[in-house]
């Protein structure tokens, strides 16, 4: 029997061992040994906890030039992301990508709603004239989603300010033919041109009004500050905003057809910050040509290309100028691409290989598909992705499109893949977002690569996203990393270790041997 060692030498003894416990990420993801892996096939080994979970920073790169406070992104699917989802994803620190299975005008209007939701100084406020009718003002309220409009002599910015019209001024006015000048609030409180944002917010706190109008020395309207924006700043400290305009960040998707060029022009005009080139197989001449055109036509617009699952696919898109990559093929809960097309790759292996390659060129990657819980998100980030795109996890939330319905006593919402027949036939035209995404716009017989279904009501993302945020912080704490940057660095250096899971190990790691149980994710 070997002699018992002195307990004081335990740390030194671990240093003398031939190798650390567990596997490095390179050893884990060796396809020659283990084949293709997905998130359930491995675990991350725990590290040293010497900090509180609240200290963990989840700040990350979405693209080369856009940084988010949380690594969570909503998918551009027509049952997941429209203006409401995109708005609250941005307020909560992530970003939403508005789908394009709709008219270009409708999509641009959704982008505009997000951009108008929160501002710093509103340098281009919507202005009306004294002769605008109450009915027209009410219509503008419906169109823009708010009702605080400055009134100038000619209805234009940089003209003399004569009043302001608010929802209180018109809410109970039944005669829509009345003119704004008859019901508006005159002599509103103003601030002098040149005040700082913090000074303007202090004035708003003191005057207890809905907005502060900024004028020059001649009384001409220059810009505006909103009290609701001040409140949102307090309620949503992690919000994703443009560094220049202080508006919420908003993304959208487009296809790779010529018609999508005009769509993009409308989106950029509406204030779009980042665009996804939406294709199930991003390594195509169509996407490469579109990518080059976008970078030439809108050099300031960030472009995320994809989808890809191999280094070779990624190389073509990086060389064409992609600012970010989207990884995944056939791994979503509503996707049947791997089954039907025999193409794709297990998501863990795809994320690791593409990220390892793309990170050498400073191109952030987004893991898209196969994510079912906080653990999966943590694993995707550990394998190298900068953000994680969620479709099914956000479907069924209050902010997702569609109406709730009841089936077998359960409250449900529709959720479908963009490769489903329902999505392909949504607009009644062959060349819609769904068919172009799967290269099917000219097919007489549509081949589905997705299914249509329903998901249970998940409540609001205003509770769900903070749950994911706190869960990710706790995951990083268990691993022993104070930030996502440190997590990635320690994975590459071999300090963060992994373990491969057998089928029995996966069974052991789940709930088992209970007669019944309730799985509550958060309070």
From Swiss-Prot:
Catalytic activity: IMP + NAD(+) + H2O = XMP + NADH + H(+)
Sequence positions that bind K(+): 330, 332, 335, 508-510
Regulation of its function: Mycophenolic acid (MPA) is a non-competitive inhibitor that prevents formation of the closed enzyme conformation by binding to the same site as the amobile flap. In contrast, mizoribine monophosphate (MZP) is a competitive inhibitor that induces the closed conformation. MPA is a potent inhibitor of mammalian IMPDHs but a poor inhibitor of the bacterial enzymes. MZP is a more potent inhibitor of bacterial IMPDH.
Cofactors: K(+)
Gene Ontology annotations of biological process type: GMP biosynthetic process; GTP biosynthetic process
Assembly description: Homotetramer. Seems to be able to form heterotetramers composed from more than 1 of the 3 IMPDH gene products (IMD2-4).
Record-given protein name: Inosine-5'-monophosphate dehydrogenase 2
Lineage: Eukaryota, Fungi, Dikarya, Ascomycota, Saccharomycotina
Encoding gene per record: IMD2
């Amino acid at each position: 029997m070997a002699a018992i060692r002195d307990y004081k030498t335990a740390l030194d003894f671990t240093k003398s061992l031939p190798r650390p416990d567990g596997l490095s990420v390179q050893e884990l993801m060796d396809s020659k040994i283990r084949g293709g892996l997905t998130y359930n096939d491995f675990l991350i080994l725990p590290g040293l906890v010497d900090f509180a979970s609240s200290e963990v920073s989840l700040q990350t790169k979405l693209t080369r030039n856009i940084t988010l406070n949380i690594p969570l992104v909503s998918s551009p699917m027509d049952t997941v992301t429209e203006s409401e989802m995109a708005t609250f994803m941005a307020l909560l620190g992530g970003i939403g990508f508005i789908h394009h299975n709709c008219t270009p005008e409708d999509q641009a209007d959704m982008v505009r709603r997000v951009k108008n939701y929160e501002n710093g100084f509103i340098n281009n406020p919507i202005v009306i004239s004294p002769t605008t009718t109450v009915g027209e003002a009410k219509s503008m309220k419906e169109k823009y989603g708010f009702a605080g409009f400055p009134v100038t002599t000619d209805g234009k910015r940089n003209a003399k300010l004569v009043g302001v019209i608010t929802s209180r001024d018109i809410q109970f006015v039944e005669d829509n033919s009345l003119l704004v000048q008859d019901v508006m609030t005159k002599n509103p409180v103003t601030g002098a041109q040149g005040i700082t944002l913090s000074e303007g917010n202090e004035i708003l706190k003191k005057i207890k009004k809905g907005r502060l109008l900024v004028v020059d020395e001649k009384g001409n309207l220059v810009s505006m500050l909103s009290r609701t924006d001040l409140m949102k700043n307090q309620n949503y400290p992690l919000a994703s905003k443009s560094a220049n305009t202080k508006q919420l960040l908003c993304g959208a998707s487009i296809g790779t057809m010529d018609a999508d060029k005009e769509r993009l022009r409308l989106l950029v005009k509406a204030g779009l910050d980042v665009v996804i080139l939406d294709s199930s197989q991003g390594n195509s001449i169509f996407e490469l040509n579109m990518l080059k055109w976008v970078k030439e036509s809108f050099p300031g617009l960030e472009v995320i290309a994809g989808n890809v699952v191999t280094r070779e696919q990624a190389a073509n898109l990086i060389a064409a100028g992609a600012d970010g990559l989207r990884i995944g093929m056939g791994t979503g809960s509503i996707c049947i691409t791997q089954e039907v097309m025999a193409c794709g790759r297990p998501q863990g292996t795809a994320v690791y290989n593409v990220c390892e390659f793309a990170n050498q060129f400073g191109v952030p990657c987004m893991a898209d598909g196969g994510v079912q819980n906080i653990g999966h998100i943590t694993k995707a980030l550990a394998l190298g992705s900068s953000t994680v795109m969620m479709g099914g996890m956000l479907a069924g939330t209050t902010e997702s499109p569609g109406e709730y319905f009841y089936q077998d006593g359960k409250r449900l919402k529709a959720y479908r893949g963009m490769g489903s027949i329902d999505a392909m036939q949504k607009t009644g035209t062959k060349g819609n977002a769904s068919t172009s995404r799967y290269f099917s716009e000219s097919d007489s017989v549509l081949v589905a690569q997705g299914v249509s279904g329903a998901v249970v009501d998940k409540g609001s993302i205003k509770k769900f996203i903070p749950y994911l945020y706190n869960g990710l912080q706790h995951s990083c704490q268990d691993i022993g990393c104070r930030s996502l940057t440190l997590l990635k660095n320690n994975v590459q250096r071999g300090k963060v270790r992994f373990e491969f899971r057998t089928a029995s190990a996966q069974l052991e790691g789940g709930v088992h041997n209970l007669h019944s149980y309730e799985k509550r994710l958060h309070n």
